[in-house]
């Protein structure tokens, strides 16, 4: 075991544990944007920087292992100042129209900026424009280049988990951004629309195409007969989302609330999150 001190608290963790993981075992949260354990540990965002006694430079917590006797400060004036500057620089290259963003209230960048008390950005705003910001509006997956913070999560999750290699870096220097790999447009790629990149994007740079208005138009059309179609994953998770105990969150109760339900068990359309087969089978058994 390696013994160290974090914010005055003695911590003992196995050899090879990162500072971020060691802090978590002690109940100390270190802000981060790009980190995904075992998938994206490249410290691209620099938000997890901490102060380590004896080190001249700030140290990224997500990819630096602990050492015996290390003394770490995660919330010292120097650590907070460094973190604040790094977040301000990220915000200077991010479209900060939070009120109209689909991730408002559920955005890691927004949360960290609020925690740091950032109310304005002292740097010139630099957002991609023209061809660098272009995207088709008809594809089910939508990307907003002006919100991308270049954390690389989408690249790594698509490469290492889905093995589809849809995303890659494009451009050089200050013009570096994320785009579809091999100079393709998204509709010509092998994108499976699994939704993993959307799920792991810490901001609103990736989202599903919004067809809400089309649904309302269909509901209002007297020439159309509409029914509700529910995927198995929704049947299993709706109660949790509403804070209902499992014995109350039954399929029958949901069907009664929706008045008309066409159960698509066994042939649901693909959804953006993976379904647990055991849960689906349990639901089928209830029937």
Where are these regions (language model features)?
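Residues at alpha-helix termini
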Residues: 25, 115, 160, 203, ...
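Fe-S ferredoxin-like electron-transfer domains
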Residues: 46-193, 199, 206-218, 224-225
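Short, basic, glycine/proline-bearing loop/turn elements
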Residues: 201-202, 240
């Amino acid at each position: 075991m390696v013994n160290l001190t974090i914010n005055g608290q003695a911590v003992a963790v196995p050899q090879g544990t990162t500072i971020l993981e060691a802090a978590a075992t002690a109940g100390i949260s270190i802000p981060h944007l790009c980190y995904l354990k075992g998938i994206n540990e490249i410290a691209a965002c620099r938000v997890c920087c901490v102060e380590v006694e004896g080190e001249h430079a700030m140290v990224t917590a997500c990819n630096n292992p602990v050492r015996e006797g290390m003394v770490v400060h995660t919330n010292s004036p120097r650590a907070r100042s460094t973190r604040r500057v790094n977040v301000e620089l990220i915000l200077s290259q991010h479209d900060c129209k939070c009120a109209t963003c689909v991730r408002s209230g559920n955005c890691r960048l927004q949360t960290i900026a609020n925690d740091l008390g950032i109310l304005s950005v002292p740097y010139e705003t630099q957002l991609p424009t023209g061809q660098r910001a272009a995207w088709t509006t008809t594809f089910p997956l939508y990307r907003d280049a002006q919100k991308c913070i270049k954390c690389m999560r989408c690249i790594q999750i698509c490469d290492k988990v889905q093995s589809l290699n849809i995303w890659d870096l494009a451009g050089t220097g200050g013009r570096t951004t994320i785009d579809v790999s091999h100079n393709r447009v998204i509709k010509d790629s092998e994108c499976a629309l699994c939704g993993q990149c959307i799920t792991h994007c810490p901001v609103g740079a990736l989202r599903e195409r919004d067809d809400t208005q089309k649904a309302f138009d269909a509901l209002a059309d007297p020439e159309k007969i509409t029914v509700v179609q529910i995927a198995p994953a929704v049947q299993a998770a709706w109660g949790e989302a509403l804070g209902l105990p499992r014995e109350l969150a039954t399929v029958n109760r949901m069907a009664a609330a929706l008045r008309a339900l066409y159960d698509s068990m066994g042939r649901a359309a693909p959804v953006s999150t993976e379904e647990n087969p055991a849960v689906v089978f349990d639901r089928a058994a209830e029937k």
